[in-house]
């Protein structure tokens, strides 16, 4: 890399260069192992070197060795909602999720240009496959190929070479609780989104659409889904997966700020790991792939178009609802001052507050329910109005200074609970 830069006549005698910007520097095959020339040679000439690239792990590996303690890293993997809304002038959490947490939708749409704006009109699976593959797997694979002297992620090299790395990553991404444990990778594959949708639709009984997902060919649907997201059963893999493999994947994602641990708190006083994916597209792409697979089912194709739209919309809305909870919690934690903590709180007898914001300085707290709905209804405030649950929280975190429902509707107030528009709430975080 030194000689390539020398070829641009950047040397001690030519000091007119003060700022050097190099885009996609990680495309250089020797970047990881020769990055020190940027700090040891060129920065010593008084230059400021600004580099960028899509291989985030490559930067992390270079910072570990060649650039250790000599660089400042700014992650762009995570784009907060307020920045997305400001730059694109689109104040919609649904669009934010559908864009995949990025500033463009091209990797989340399908071949038909109209499909980008039609959640249920999928044409083929290539764009979803492309997004899932490029979001994480190709990133780590590129670094494994170019880290010639590295040992840190060598446990993943064999998985990469056998084409089985994406299987491990996507099994964890689609798991309801994103658990980094061996069982999640080794157990027979199940779609948590499909199972959740089956249960939700039963609330529509006696309507015929309530049981549609029990009548489709679930096995074939899951086989199609597995093919799209490159998931394999244990018997189909060649490399025995160990907990060490999974721990390395987790470490990698943490290094890149693609996952964040937002610990849950319990009435008993315990805390538990709660992994949140900071790039929403990693999760939403799999939900889209499930809907595409469902649309190919012969029985599903025979039901009324209105029912198709309702059911596929139900699947995606359910996923968006869970993702919205994570988005709000993550963004509040990232912007909260050191005197405040934000966390999900669970009760021993069942139920939870989606978010508690604890003001350690003022010794009080605010409690929140987070809903994807655009309509306010009494059910949304059930836990917030539960006197026993409120007493439990007040005993731990001081008086409750406010009760809130964050949703996609208009600001309003009812029965002691403030309804706030979630998009305005997120845009107001600083």
Q: Language-model segments: which ranges?
A:
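Conserved Walker B catalytic segment
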Residues: 25-50
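Short regulatory helix/loop adjacent to the ATP-binding pocket of P-loop NTPases
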Residues: 37, 57-72
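Amphipathic alpha-helical segments of the small helical/lid subdomains adjacent to P-loop NTPase cores
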Residues: 73-156
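Short glycine-rich substrate-engagement loop in P-loop NTPases that contacts/grips substrate
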Residues: 1-12
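Conserved P-loop NTPase "ATPase switch" module shared by AAA+ and STAND
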Residues: 10-32
């Amino acid at each position: 890399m030194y000689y390539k830069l020398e070829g641009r006549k950047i040397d001690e005698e030519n000091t007119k260069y003060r700022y050097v910007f190099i885009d996609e520097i990680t495309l250089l095959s020797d970047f990881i192992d020769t990055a020190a020339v940027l700090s040891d040679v060129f920065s010593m000439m008084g230059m400021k070197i600004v580099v960028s690239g899509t291989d985030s792990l490559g930067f992390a590996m270079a910072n570990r060795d060649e650039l250790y303690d000599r660089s400042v890293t700014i992650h762009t993997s995570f784009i907060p909602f307020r920045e997305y809304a400001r730059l694109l002038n689109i104040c919609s959490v649904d669009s934010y999720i559908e864009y995949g947490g990025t500033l463009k939708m091209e990797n989340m749409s399908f071949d038909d240009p109209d499909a980008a704006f039609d959640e249920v009109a999928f044409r083929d699976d290539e764009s979803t496959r492309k997004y899932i593959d490029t979001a994480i797997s190709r990133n780590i694979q590129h670094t494994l190929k170019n880290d010639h002297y590295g040992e840190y992620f060598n446990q993943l090299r064999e998985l990469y070479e056998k084409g089985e790395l994406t299987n491990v990553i996507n099994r964890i991404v689609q798991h309801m609780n994103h658990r980094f444990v061996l069982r999640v990778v080794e157990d027979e594959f199940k779609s948590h989104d499909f199972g959740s949708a089956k249960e939700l639709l039963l609330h529509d009984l006696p309507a015929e659409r309530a049981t549609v997902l029990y009548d489709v060919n679930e096995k074939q649907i899951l086989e199609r889904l597995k093919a799209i997201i490159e998931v394999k059963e244990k018997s189909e893999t060649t490399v025995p997966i160990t907990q060490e493999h999974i721990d390395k994947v987790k470490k990698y994602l943490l290094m890149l700020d693609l996952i964040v641990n937002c610990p849950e708190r319990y009435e008993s006083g315990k805390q538990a790991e709660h992994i949140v994916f900071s790039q929403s597209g990693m999760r939403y792409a799999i939900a889209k792939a499930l809907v595409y697979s469902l649309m190919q089912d012969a029985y599903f194709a025979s039901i009324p178009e209105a029912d198709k739209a309702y059911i596929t919309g139900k699947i995606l809305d359910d996923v968006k609802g869970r993702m919205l909870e994570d988005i709000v919690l993550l963004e509040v934690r990232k912007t909260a001052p050191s005197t405040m903590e934000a966390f999900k709180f669970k009760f021993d007898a069942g139920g939870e507050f989606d978010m508690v914001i604890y003001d350690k300085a003022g010794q009080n707290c605010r409690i929140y329910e987070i809903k994807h709905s655009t309509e306010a209804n009494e059910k949304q405030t059930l836990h917030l109005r539960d006197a026993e649950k409120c007493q439990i929280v007040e005993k731990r975190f001081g008086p409750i200074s406010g009760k809130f429902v964050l949703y996609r509707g208009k600001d309003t107030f009812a029965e002691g609970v403030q309804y706030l528009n979630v998009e305005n709430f997120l845009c107001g975080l600083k």
